[in-house]
């Protein structure tokens, strides 16, 4: 059970209520004090007035019974870890002892109060300190028996002093409220309060004695069971606040605990039959008036309290009070205090129940919630039966109530984090192994739900892998599929290749396997419609199926047109495009016929200007591609029947247009056959060099996506480009330095002077001049300066150094010009330029 109360993944986020912080700070002190002081006065803080009346007469029987109850309380931790069979044994043994204990009910109630208080502190300790404290406390329970019995006989004055000390130290918020009401009617109110605390817990104990009702008691637990450490002090606070009269100070927590106690009571209709038989057998002789009092007081309080936790408080309080003292006064006092609070809390508890009702419906779990009407009606019958139960069950109830409140009160926190519910259902199946025998029906439901979801995930993962294999192929088939795709698009590469395609770098081809595997993983992640993101609990990262579908559509929109079903955004353009494609195919067919009949094939040439004009329109390019212009272009570029290439002008224009077209999908390339035509031109010996270059670029661009390589260098950052260059350099160096040349170390060591050059006659000496080794250094080509530097300073120094040479050269050039004669010798009148 400690594992249920404290699980590391659901740690306290401190988000419950402000009072929780006080409880957390007090919980450590309370747990430590209860372990260090076995008979500490806080155990007796609430039973002192009842001890005044009854302790003298029944201390011996009370101590004997307490040993039984203590033994039962120690056994309480074990049945939760083993099975509910032991729970039934414990309850039966307690029922057998009920006749002995009724004489000292108030004393037993007081000591049960101690046990419930001390049992709460381990739970708080489990949440706040460590999991070891409940274990230690379970051991210390048996050790504390004797000191508690001794201190039960202490003087009343000592108890008053110790009570005030313990109240101020540990449980000031809750127990001072108890003491406030104790001032009004001390003996009766204290007894009723202590029993009141036991009886609502008793309510929860029935639902816990048979663990299937435990889960039915908090149906939302099936959706979000162990958020257990979510509010550490809440497991104590709701129980104590049912005791306290000033409940309106903490309405929020009461609303939570109210709705949860209501749920636990509502679930007990499953166990009523068994309980009624056991309890009526044990208590018929003693508790007949109690039952009547309970039924009377319940009928008064039910109309107001059906949906609130005051239903648990008032009715259970009155029958338990009537066991010892006059029930009318206590019922009056309690109901006066409780009825206003009932009215206040009905609304809040109903709201919280409605919220909890909605959540299982939204999550579509298999344990449907009972309606609130059936809960309240079951509670009416159940409380009459439970009022007759002996008070010996109070101790058992206190511990089971504690765990029930822990699990139930967390449902509100679990509602805030509903994204984690599925994972919690799976973990609850593991955590609830402590209730293994009793929880089998519920665990079967949970296991079936978890197994169903796991099967769905497996199916989805299988379909994802299949779709990924369809898109990218498995690793074993990736190379074959790439080869097949290349063969389909560009044709089989036979031995008749005149020119080898050198489009790819070797590094790109080497890295293609890793790239394709990465792409496959990305595609599988993109195609996954599973709820893995939900299960991880990271709601921020979660993307709905609709978002994933949109992203897929966007990624496909570049390759495929969205509306291929005939509905287009430019209806008249479609007509133009289709007519153009029809004309192109007809012209190609006519040219083939003319060529086969040995006539000049000029139809394509005459139609070429019109085709180029339309294909260059930017807004029609996508429409052309979708309408099948690629197959028409292939018809124009394929050789004629006499194996002659089409006109050079046709090839040039169409290759340029193909280069300008947007990215073409692999399906289009495969079905149109344009790749084979381009590859034929690329390999053809009579094709012009510019056309071969364009064809090589096209092949490179179209085949890169098949190998998962990028062709967009503009999109690469500078660092990526530098990294790519660095990765390519060593292979180039290896390629350049490989060959039958002298080893590199000789030149390096000779140049550095470490090793002397080989002399003639020494091994390894070659008696001939050698070509120098290629450099092993990496040189990065420095690009031209795009920014004009301030060249004035450089120009000034250059002028000073070169000015004389420039002057002499200019003079020399001028003299040459003067000495040269024109075509006709001009005779100057003055005779200056006449040749002598």
Curated annotation (Swiss-Prot):
Residues 476-485 have a biased composition (Acidic residues). Keywords: mRNA processing, mRNA splicing, mRNA transport, Nucleus, Transcription, Transcription regulation, Transport. GO terms for cellular component: nucleus. Its main location: nucleus. Residues 1-542, 714-746 are annotated as: Disordered. GO terms for biological process: mRNA processing; poly(A)+ mRNA export from nucleus; RNA splicing. Transcription factor which plays a key role in defining the composition of the RNA polymerase II (RNAPII) elongation complex and in modulating the production of mature mRNA transcripts. Belongs to the IWS1 family. This is Protein IWS1 homolog A.
């Amino acid at each position: 059970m400690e594992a249920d109360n404290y699980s590391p993944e659901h740690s306290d986020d401190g988000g419950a209520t402000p009072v929780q912080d006080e409880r957390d700070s007090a919980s450590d002190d309370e747990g430590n004090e209860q372990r260090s002081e076995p008979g500490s006065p806080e155990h007796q803080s609430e039973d002192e007035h009842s001890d005044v009346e009854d302790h003298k007469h029944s201390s011996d029987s009370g101590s004997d019974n307490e040993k039984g109850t203590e033994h039962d309380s120690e056994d309480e931790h074990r049945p939760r870890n083993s099975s509910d069979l032991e729970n039934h044994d414990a309850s039966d043994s307690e029922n057998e002892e009920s006749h002995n204990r009724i004489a000292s009910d108030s004393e037993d109630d007081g000591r049960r109060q101690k046990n419930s208080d001390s049992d709460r502190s381990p739970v708080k300790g489990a949440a706040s300190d460590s999991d070891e404290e409940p274990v230690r406390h379970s051991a210390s329970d048996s050790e504390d028996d004797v000191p508690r019995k001794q201190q039960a006989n202490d003087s009343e004055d000592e108890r008053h002093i110790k009570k005030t000390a313990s109240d101020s130290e540990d449980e000031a918020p809750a127990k001072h409220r108890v003491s406030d009401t104790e001032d009004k009617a001390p003996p009766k109110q204290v007894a009723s309060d202590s029993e009141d605390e036991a009886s609502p817990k008793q309510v929860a104990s029935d639902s816990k004695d048979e663990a299937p009702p435990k889960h039915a008691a908090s149906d939302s637990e099936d959706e979000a069971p162990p958020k257990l450490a979510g509010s550490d002090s809440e497991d104590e606070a709701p129980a104590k606040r049912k005791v306290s009269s000033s409940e309106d100070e903490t309405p929020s927590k009461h609303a939570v605990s109210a709705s949860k106690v209501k749920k636990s009571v509502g679930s007990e209709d499953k166990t009523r039959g068994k309980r009624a038989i056991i309890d009526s057998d044990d208590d018929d002789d003693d508790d007949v008036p109690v039952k009547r009092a309970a039924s009377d007081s319940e009928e008064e309080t039910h109309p107001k309290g059906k949906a609130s936790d005051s239903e648990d408080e008032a009715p259970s309080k009155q029958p338990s009070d009537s066991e010892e003292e006059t029930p009318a006064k206590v019922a009056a006092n309690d109901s006066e205090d409780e009825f206003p609070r009932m009215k206040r809390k009905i609304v809040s508890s109903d709201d919280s129940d409605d919220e909890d009702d909605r959540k299982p419906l939204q999550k579509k779990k298999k344990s449907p919630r009972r309606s609130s009407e059936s809960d309240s009606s079951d509670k009416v019958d159940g409380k009459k039966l439970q009022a007759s139960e002996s008070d010996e069950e109070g101790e058992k109830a206190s511990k089971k109530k504690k765990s029930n409140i822990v699990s139930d009160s967390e449902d509100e926190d679990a509602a805030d984090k509903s994204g984690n519910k599925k994972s919690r259902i799976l973990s609850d199946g593991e955590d609830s192994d402590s209730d293994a025998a009793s929880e089998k029906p519920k665990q079967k439901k949970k296991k079936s739900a978890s197994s169903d979801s796991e099967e769905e995930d497996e199916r989805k993962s299988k379909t994802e892998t299949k779709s990924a294999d369809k898109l990218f192929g498995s690793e074993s088939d990736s190379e074959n599929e790439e080869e097949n795709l290349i063969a389909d698009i560009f044709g089989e590469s036979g031995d008749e290749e005149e020119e080898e395609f050198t489009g790819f770098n070797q590094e790109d081809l080497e890295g293609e396997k890793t790239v394709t595997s990465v792409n496959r993983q990305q595609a599988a992640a993109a195609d996954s419609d599973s709820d893995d993101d939900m299960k991880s609990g990271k709601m921020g990262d979660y993307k709905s199926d609709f978002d994933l579908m949109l992203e897929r559509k966007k990624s496909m929109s570049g390759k495929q047109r969205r509306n291929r079903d005939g509905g287009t955004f430019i209806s008249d353009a479609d007509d133009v495009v289709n007519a153009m494609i029809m004309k192109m195919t007809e012209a190609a067919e006519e040219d083939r016929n003319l060529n086969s009949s040995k006539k000049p094939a000029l139809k394509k040439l005459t139609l070429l200007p019109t085709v180029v004009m339309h294909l260059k329109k930017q807004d029609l390019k996508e429409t052309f591609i979708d309408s099948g212009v690629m197959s028409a272009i292939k018809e124009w570029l394929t050789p004629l029947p006499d194996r002659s290439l089409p006109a050079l002008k046709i090839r040039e224009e169409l290759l340029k247009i193909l280069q300008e077209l947007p990215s073409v999908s692999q399906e289009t390339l495969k079905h149109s056959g344009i790749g084979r035509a381009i590859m034929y031109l690329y390999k053809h010996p009579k094709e012009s060099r510019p056309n071969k270059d364009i064809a090589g670029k096209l092949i490179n661009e179209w085949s890169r996506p098949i190998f998962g390589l990028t062709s967009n260098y503009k999109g690469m950052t500078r660092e990526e480009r530098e990294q790519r260059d660095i990765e390519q350099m060593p292979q180039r160096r290896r390629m350049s330095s490989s060959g039958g040349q002298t080893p590199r170390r000789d030149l390096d060591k000779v140049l550095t002077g470490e090793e002397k050059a080989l002399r003639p006659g020494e091994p390894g000496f070659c008696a001939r001049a050698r070509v120098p080794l290629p450099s092993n250094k990496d040189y990065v080509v420095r690009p031209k300066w795009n920014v004009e530097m301030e060249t004035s300073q450089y120009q000034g120094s250059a002028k000073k150094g070169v000015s004389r040479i420039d002057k002499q050269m200019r003079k020399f050039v001028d003299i040459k010009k003067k000495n040269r004669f024109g075509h006709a010798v001009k005779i100057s009148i003055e005779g200056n330029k006449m040749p002598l």
